[in-house]
Structures are given as C-alpha cells and as structure tokens.
C-alpha cells in the first residue's frame, strides 16, 4: 500500500507538471486568436487558419516534450541512489513500475485531451468535450472495474489508459474537424 501511494504521487507529479503547460497553451492560443483576428486580411483567411493549426501542433509538441522531461525526472526519482530506494530503504517491484508507466502514459493522454477541450471551449464548442469526457469516464470505470475485479487489481490502470485514450481521440477529432471547417 505504501509503495502504491508513492507511485501514485509520481503520477500526480506528471499530471501537475502538464497542467502548467496547459495553462500556458490556452493563454497563448487566446492571445493568438485576439491578435490574429485584428491583423488578418479578410481576403486571406487561409493564412490565419494555417497558423492556427501550426500553433496547435506546436502546443501538442510542447506537451510531449514536457511529458518526456517529467518521465526522466521520475525515472531518476525511482532509480537514482538518492531516490526512492535511498530514502525509503525499499526496492520497487516491477509491477509497481509497470503500473506507474501505464498511469503516466494515461495522464499524458488525459492532458492532451484536456488541451483539446480547452481549445474547443475557447472556440465555443462546449458539447463535444463534455460528451467525450462522459464516454471516457464510462470506459474508465467499466473497464477498470472489470479488469481489477476479474484479473488483478493493477489492471485498473488499463481502464484509465483506455478512457484517457478515448477522451483524447474524440477531442482531437473535434479539433481537427473544426480546423478543417475554418
């Protein structure tokens, strides 16, 4: 139980680091839209649309770069001599590390879905992210519950990963469709 709570703290750390990236991303997106609407010539809206798409993918790249840095940081916390084993005098079992990695990937997908949702909310499309989060929660709870009860408790993280994946896919699709229709 103690090891599980430490690993959960690592996953929360990943998510909190990514939340800062989300805050930066939506602030720069809003600023871009405000400035872009003022300076874009009405005869060349495709230039604005292309810049908007480019900025979105730059924000996704920033999210992944931050995620990679967070994973490296957590890897050192787990494996460095001054890290987990040095502080708690216990070694982490492979299962705990596996659950942590799967959970971390799930949190990255969740953060990407949240970035997509922030874009959609900013653009006035509120229903699509709400539907996506409802579907994701249903998948997370049902799949996580079934796997954890009938196979092993650690498989509940697979439900979270799948739910986050569905959330990301649905919100990404909504963003791409919006960008295509600009």
Residue ranges and their predicted role:
Residues 23-27, 31, 75-87, 123, ...:
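Transmembrane helix-loop junctions in multipass membrane proteins, especially transporters and channels
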Residues 5-83:
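Specific pore-lining/lateral-gate transmembrane helices of multi-pass inner-membrane transport
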